[in-house]
C-alpha cells in the first residue's frame, strides 16, 4: 500500500542518496575496486567477479529501459525489508519506518529489496550458506498481495519485470559488498 498511496506524487522529490539503487553505478564501483585491488584480495574472489560480470548487462535492464523512455521512476521507499515494518501484537502491519531513503526509483526497488530479506530462508548476515535459499511460497504470496493494490498503477512492463526485481537485489548487494571487500 505504501507505493499505492504515493503513486500520484510527482517524482520531483529529491534523491536522498545519489545512485543508491543504480546498478550501473554499483558495477562501476566494483570495476574500480577490481582495477585498484587495494586490499590485495582480488585473486581469491576473481571467480565471483567473473560471475557478476557475466550477468551485468541483464542486471542493468532497469537503467537501460529508463534511458529508452520505457520505464519511469516512481516514489519508492528504497530500503524495504521486514525490519523496516512495524507490526502490532497480532502481527498486523502498523506502518513503514526508516523513511530517510524515500526517493524516486524504479518500482523494482521496493519489490525486489523486500523479497531479498523476506524470502531469504536464512538471516541477512547468515554465516552458514546452507541456511540461505529463496522461499518461492513467500515470493508467490508477496507478489499476489502486492499486485492486488499495485496493479492499478503499474505498467505492463513493470509487472512483467517483477521477477527480475527479485533477482536484482541479491545481485546488487553482492556487487556492493564485494566491492567493499576488495577495497
Give the positions of each predicted feature:
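Active-site-proximal structural scaffolding
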Residues: 69, 78, 89, 104-107, ...
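Active-site activation/catalytic loop segments of kinase-like enzymes and analogous catalytic loops
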Residues: 108-152, 168-183
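A broadly conserved amphipathic alpha-helix scaffold signal in soluble, globular proteins
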Residues: 1-4, 57
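Catalytic activation segment of kinase domains across protein kinase-like and atypical kinase folds
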Residues: 83-123
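ATP-dependent phospho-/nucleotidyl transfer catalytic cores
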Residues: 8-77, 82-90, 168
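A structural signal for short hydrophobic/aromatic patches embedded in well-ordered alpha helices
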Residues: 52, 142, 161-162
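All-alpha amphipathic helical-bundle segments outside canonical DNA-binding/catalytic cores
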Residues: 154-166
